[in-house]
Amino acid sequence: MIATSSSPLNLTQQLIRDHLVSGEMSPGKEIALRMDQALLQDVLGALVMLELEAMGLDRVHTEPTVQYIDHGLIQADNLNAETHLFLKSACERFGVWYSGPGNGISHPVHMEFFGVPGQSLVGCDSHTTAAGSLGMLALGAGGIEVAMAMAGEPLYLNMPNILGIRLEGCLPDWVSAKDAILELLRRHGVSGCKDTILEYYGPGVSSLSVMDRHVVANLGTEMGATATVFPSDEETLRFLSARGREADWVPLAAEPGCGYDLEETLNLSNLEPLIALPSSPDKVVPVREIAGEPLHQAYIGSSGNPGYRDFAVVAEMVRGRTIAEGVSLDVNPSSRQVLTALIREGHLEHLVSCGARLHQAGCNGCIGMGQAPAVGRNSLRTVPRNFPG
């Protein structure tokens, strides 16, 4: 049962309360929320900047606002390069941070440099929800809505249901956070959490690193979720402290005795390696059921698994070995910081020496921007998407 105004509040309710401009926290009712931060990617970023110009805005009101160049990286002609120049000039015009091509994917980079527990974030990218891993209220929206938020106007939406997911246990060996969200996709499907915010709580949360939580929050989008919210705890403090940002940390958690509109439990200890078959993220089966299928491409790196560990583990697996004949191993670093760390620790040498192909840090194959497999060939990918287009 959902809490009343005088009842204990879950974390999502606390975040919404702290940013509520108008409306009531009743599912289905329209609410207006103040946005603290804004995130842009380059496909919709140009449209947002044109909207700001049409408004006659002098300077954006959200701080920080960051324009990331992570989609249009292939410069087969002059168009992407000219878009980059336009966006850089627009950032200077409106007081927006600019992250140029090659710096990395917006979501993990934003977490590292700008994410603050308790703040709200709106982004013109569907996977903006990833910032919920830090205890933020992070929402994806269309270009016009994002432009209005940057101009100081509230973001309007209908109050979502809140699904409380209690995490128990811890991940077994060779099971990752990706398996946790794949299990939820198996349960709910790609549209089962529409108009719903997913809030994770319980003893299993502390066993997940912030980058593990990022994986789960990122793929909440594939379930149709409005947002994903994790508490801000000691793991969050550890993540921020490692980046010299411990001053940004605040502890955040659901109040004892709070309720949710919907509830379920996920025991991490019971999970096994899972995989989503073509062509939908919810077509989930155990990996053991398809073991032995021929593989022609393995693609590692996206906003769905951006952490250093994801690449380092693969590097150790291929160390001193050579990839099989006829297989393309594509390595797509999620950020310049991850790439630098892989170089410093010697992991990149193992990846390159085994025959891997190294791509620039960005969205690339996840959005269909390169690395398309041959017709009829199996491509194993860590990206959130496995459907045509």
Predicted features along the sequence, with ranges:
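Fe-S-dependent hydro-lyases/dehydratases of central metabolism
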Residues: M1-G389
